[in-house]
C-alpha cells in the first residue's frame, strides 16, 4: 500500500532537540502542515478524507478507508495479539470446565448432599448456572461500555473463584445451587466480553481464528474436566476436589490480565489516543508511524459517529433505539440471536452436561471414562475449525456441518429405538456403540461449525450497538442453555430418548434452512463492510457475499 498520495492523520515525532510534537500530515509524509506541542492526553485527531475522496486518490485506498483497514493489516502481525487472545481465552477454559465437571459430579454425588438427588434436583443444580449466566449476559453489554471490557473480566474471575469454593464446600443442595449460580454469573460475563474484546483487538484477516481461541479453550476445559471426572470417580468425595480445581485458572487469568491492554475502541471512546497508538504499534511492528496514526484516526472517527455527546443513560437509550430502528442493525441482531438459538437447540449442552448419565442409560459400565471421548471429539474438531474458518469461510462450514449434525442426531434417535428396555441385563446389543458413534458424528460436526460460529457475533455489529447487540445474542444463548439443561432429563422420560434426539434433529433442520437464506459469508471482511453488506437485505447479502468465495479461499470484494 502506497501512503504517499493519501491524506494522512497525525503522528508523534521529535525535533532536533528531542522535544516531542504532533505532526499533521498533508498528502506526503515529508510535508508537514503544522507542529503543536505533544501532550500525553491527546484529545483530537484531524478529520480524514471520506471513502470517495480516498478512492479517487488511490484505487487501493478503500482497503484503508474501512474501519479495520485491510491494506494496513496486510503488514506483519506480532505474536503479541495471539498472547492477548490466549489470556482472554482462559475464560473459555472456565466455561468449558464447568460444563464438563458437572457431568461427572452428578454421576458420583450419591447422598453427599444429604440424600440421593432426584432428576429434578439434578436439573436444578445444572440449570442454576445457565440462569445466572442469562442475567449477567443481559446486563453486561452496557456495563462493558461503561467500565470497560478488561475490568469486567477481572470481576468475572473473582466471581468464579468464590463460586468454585462454595461448590467444593457444599453440604446440601441449596448451597450447591448458590455456588453454581455465582459461577454462572461470572461465566455469563465472560461469554459476552471475551469474543467482543478479541474482535476489537483482532486484525480482520485473523479475526475468525482469534475468536475461535476462546472456543478452543471451552472445549479444552471440557476435555480436562472429563479427564478429571474419570481420575476422581472412585475417590471419596472427589467431586469437591474437581470443583475446587476450577478456581486455579481463574486466579491465573486474574493475575495475567494486569499486563493486558483495554480494548482500543473503548480507549478511544474515552480519549486515550496515545494508548491506542502504542497498542496498534505493538500489534503491527513493521507498520509505518503514519499508517498507525491513520488507523487510529479511522477508529476514532467511527467512535465519534457511534457515540455522540451525552451521558451514559442517553448513550444506552440511543443505542437501544438505533439497534431496533436501523434495518441493518436489526438484521445483525436477528443473525446473532438466531445463531445462538441454533447452537443451543441443537442439543449439544444436553450431551455435555449429562453425557455420563446418557452413557449409563445405554449400558456402558464405565460411563464417566466414555465421556472423555465426547470432550476429545469436541476439542479436536474445534482445532479443525480454527484452521479453516478464515480460509473456507463461516457460511460454507456452517451449511455443510449442519447437514451432518442432522444425520448424527437422526442416527442416535434410531439407535435408541432399537436398544433393549433394560440395558443392565443386555449390554452387548451393539446399539449402544451406535449411540456413541452417532454422538461422536454429531459433536465433530457441531464443533466444526455452529459450536464456534455464533461467538463471531461481535463482528456483526457496528461500535454503536456492538455491546448491546452482542448482549442480546448472548442472552439468547443462555435462554436456550437454561431451557435445555432444565428439561433434558424430563424430556428423556416423557417423550423417550428417541423422541428427544429426533426433536433436536428437527431444530437443526430449521437452523440449516434459515442459515441458507439469511447468513452471508463474512470471513475476511472488515466490520464496517459487514455493516454495509447487511444494509442490502438478507438474501442480497447472501448472494453478494458468496461471490467472494473462489476455489476454497476468501477474497475481499
From Swiss-Prot:
One of its GO terms (cellular component) is membrane. GO terms for biological process: myo-inositol import across plasma membrane. This is Myo-inositol transporter 2. It comes from Schizosaccharomyces pombe (strain 972 / ATCC 24843). It catalyses: myo-inositol(out) + H(+)(out) = myo-inositol(in) + H(+)(in). The keyword NAD does not apply. Transporter for myo-inositol. Residues 30-44 have a biased composition (Basic and acidic residues). Residues 1-76, 121-123, 179-180, 231-240, 389-396, 454-468, 520-557 are cytoplasmic. It is found in: Membrane. Residues 24-69 are annotated as: Disordered.
Amino acid at each position: 500500500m502506497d501512503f504517499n498520495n493519501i491524506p494522512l492523520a497525525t503522528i508523534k515525532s521529535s525535533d532536533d532537540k528531542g522535544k516531542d510534537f504532533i505532526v499533521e500530515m498533508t498528502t506526503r509524509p515529508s510535508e508537514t502542515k503544522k507542529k503543536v506541542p505533544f501532550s500525553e492526553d491527546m484529545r483530537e485527531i484531524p478529520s480524514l478524507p471520506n471513502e470517495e475522496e480516498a478512492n479517487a486518490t488511490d484505487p487501493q485506498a478503500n482497503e484503508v478507508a474501512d474501519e479495520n483497514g485491510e491494506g494496513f493489516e496486510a503488514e506483519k502481525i506480532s505474536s503479541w495479539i495471539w498472547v492477548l487472545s490466549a489470556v482472554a481465552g482462559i475464560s473459555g477454559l472456565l466455561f468449558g470446565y464447568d460444563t464438563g465437571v458437572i457431568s461427572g459430579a452428578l454421576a458420583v454425588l450419591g447422598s453427599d448432599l444429604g440424600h440421593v438427588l432426584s432428576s429434578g434436583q439434578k436439573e436444578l443444580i445444572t440449570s442454576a448456572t445457565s440462569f445466572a449466566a442469562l442475567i449477567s449476559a443481559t446486563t453486561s453489554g452496557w456495563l462493558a461500555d461503561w467500565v470497560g471490557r478488561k475490568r469486567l473480566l477481572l470481576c468475572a474471575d473473582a466471581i468464579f473463584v468464590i463460586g468454585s469454593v462454595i461448590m467444593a464446600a457444599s453440604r446440601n443442595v441449596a448451597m450447591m445451587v448458590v455456588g453454581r449460580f455465582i459461577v454462572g454469573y461470572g461465566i455469563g460475563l465472560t461469554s459476552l466480553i471475551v469474543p467482543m474484546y478479541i474482535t476489537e483487538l483482532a486484525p480482520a484477516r485473523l479475526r475468525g481464528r482469534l475468536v475461535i481461541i476462546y472456543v478452543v479453550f471451552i472445549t479444552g476445559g471440557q476435555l480436562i474436566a472429563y479427564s478429571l471426572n474419570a481420575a476422581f470417580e472412585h475417590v471419596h468425595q472427589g467431586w469437591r476436589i474437581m470443583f475446587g480445581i476450577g478456581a486455579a485458572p481463574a486466579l491465573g487469568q486474574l493475575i495475567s490480565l494486569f499486563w493486558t491492554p483495554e480494548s482500543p475502541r473503548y480507549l478511544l471512546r474515552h480519549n486515550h489516543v496515545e494508548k491506542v497508538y502504542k497498542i496498534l504499534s505493538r500489534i503491527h511492528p513493521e507498520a509505518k508511524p503514519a499508517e498507525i496514526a491513520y488507523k487510529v484516526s479511522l477508529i476514532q472517527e467511527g467512535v465519534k459517529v457511534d457515540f455522540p455527546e451525552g451521558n451514559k443513560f442517553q448513550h444506552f437509550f440511543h443505542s437501544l433505539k438505533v439497534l431496533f430502528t436501523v434495518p441493518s442493525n436489526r438484521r445483525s441482531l436477528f443473525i446473532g440471536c438466531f445463531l445462538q438459538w441454533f447452537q443451543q437447540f441443537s442439543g449439544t449442552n444436553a450431551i455435555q452436561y449429562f453425557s455420563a448419565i446418557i452413557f449409563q442409560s445405554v449400558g456402558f459400565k464405565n460411563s464417566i471414562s466414555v465421556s472423555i471421548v465426547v470432550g476429545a471429539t469436541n476439542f479436536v474438531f474445534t482445532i479443525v475449525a480454527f484452521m479453516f474458518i478464515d480460509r473456507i469461510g463461516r457460511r460454507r462450514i456452517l451449511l455443510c456441518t449442519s447437514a451432518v449434525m442432522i444425520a448424527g442426531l437422526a442416527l442416535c434417535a434410531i439407535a435408541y429405538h432399537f436398544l433393549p428396555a433394560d440395558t443392565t441385563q443386555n449390554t452387548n446389543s451393539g446399539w449402544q456403540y451406535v449411540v456413541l458413534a452417532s454422538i461422536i458424528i454429531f459433536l465433530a460436526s457441531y464443533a466444526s461449525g455452529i459450536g464456534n460460529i455464533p461467538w463471531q457475533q461481535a463482528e456483526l455489529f457496528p461500535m454503536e450497538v456492538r455491546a448491546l447487540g452482542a448482549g442480546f445474542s448472548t442472552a439468547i444463548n443462555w435462554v436456550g442453555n437454561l431451557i435445555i439443561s432444565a428439561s433434558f432429563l424430563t424430556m428423556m422420560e416423557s417423550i423417550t430418548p428417541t423422541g428427544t434426539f429426533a426433536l433436536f434433529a428437527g431444530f437443526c433442520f430449521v437452523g440449516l434452512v434459515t442459515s441458507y437464506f439469511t447468513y452471508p459469508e463474512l470471513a475476511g471482511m472488515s466490520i464496517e463492510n459487514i455493516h454495509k453488506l447487511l444494509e442490502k437485505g438478507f438474501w442480497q447479502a447472501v448472494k453478494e457475499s458468496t461471490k467472494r468465495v473462489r476455489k476454497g479461499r476468501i477474497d475481499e470484494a
